[in-house]
Amino acid sequence: MYNVRTDLAVESREIYKHRYNREIDGVVFEEKTVEEDIKVTNVDILNEEGAKAMEKPIGRYVTIDIPDYTHYDGGIMDEVSHVVAASLEELINLPEERTALVVGLGNWNVTPDAIGPKVVGKLMVTRHLKKVMPDIIDDSVRPVCAIAPGVLGITGIETGEIIKSLVEKIKPDLVVCIDALASRKLERVARTIQISNTGISPGAGVGNHRMQINEESLGIPVIALGVPTVVDAATIANDAMDLVLDEMINQADAGKEFYNILNNIDKNEKGMMIKSLLDPYVGDLMVTPKEIDDIIESVSKIIANGINIALQPNMVLEDINKFLN
């Protein structure tokens, strides 16, 4: 069977529904529009049956769809940050005095994969200040620490091993991970933010399966945030072929032999054929927008502000920005 590569729970549900023409047992879906043109979708996987169908762990997956002009509008960016913060606050059940560790996953040398390290560079980190300036930084400020551990190819160390060692040493009460994801649809690239309470597997979106970073492996809750920055080239080619076939079917005379041939093409077999044809030439090629540098810069700011607001509930964004500046 042709498996479409995606990290987004909302897309996994769409693929299943399209393939089997029914909803998934054990999965609850809720969609709402907040603020201006910002859509929030909650996908709750409740049991093993739902997890197997979705190919994702049991838990909540929040998808925030943002307008395509967000990256060029500071006001909309701040609105999205507050939506991200509100979604995070629903998943973070942590007293203010407890420590949070934020981890920016990804390779800072590869732009589509650099969103995690970029977010870390924009965070309000306070754990060290709580120790060296206790008279100035009061109990209303949460101790937050952050790290961008790089990738296995740079460090020679599994990212999960680095994080586990840090957790054992500094003993945080929560880990928040940020990583780049893969999407099934081009229109979701850099326009979707996924938040989940199930942890993350670094590199899974592009086929590099590493050690899981979740509550089971670390012993504390793990919140994962991700933004799709790449799409599988075979998926793009398959979608383009679907558009061509649909148009040819619309133009053909219904009931005629050519119409019947087009209408009976197995889309699953077509997908596998395109994948096998492309493999010798491009392998696992991933495609990203040409303006990805600007996109990563703006999306990382949105996510960093959202995390800052969620982890520091006693501060407003204006005060956080003053602190950072």
From Swiss-Prot:
GO BP of this protein: proteolysis; spore germination
Residue ranges the record assigns to the propeptide: 1-7
Catalysed reaction, written as an equation: Endopeptidase action with P4 Glu or Asp, P1 preferably Glu > Asp, P1' hydrophobic and P2' Ala
Gene3D superfamilies reported in the protein's UniProt record: HybD-like (3.40.50.1450)
GO molecular function: metalloendopeptidase activity
InterPro entries the record matches: Pept_HybD-like_dom_sf, Peptidase_A25
UniProtKB keywords: Hydrolase, Protease, Zymogen
Annotated transmembrane regions: none
Signal peptide location: none
EC number: 3.4.24.78
Processing after translation: Autoproteolytically processed. The inactive tetrameric zymogen termed p46 autoprocesses to a smaller form termed p41, which is active only during spore germination.
UniProt KW Glycosyltransferase keyword: no
Record has Repressor as a keyword: no
Enzyme class of the recorded protein, top EC level: hydrolase
Family: Belongs to the peptidase A25 family.
Function of the protein: Initiates the rapid degradation of small, acid-soluble proteins during spore germination.
Assembly and interaction partners: Homotetramer.
Protein name per Swiss-Prot or TrEMBL: Germination protease
Species, as recorded: Clostridium perfringens (strain SM101 / Type A)
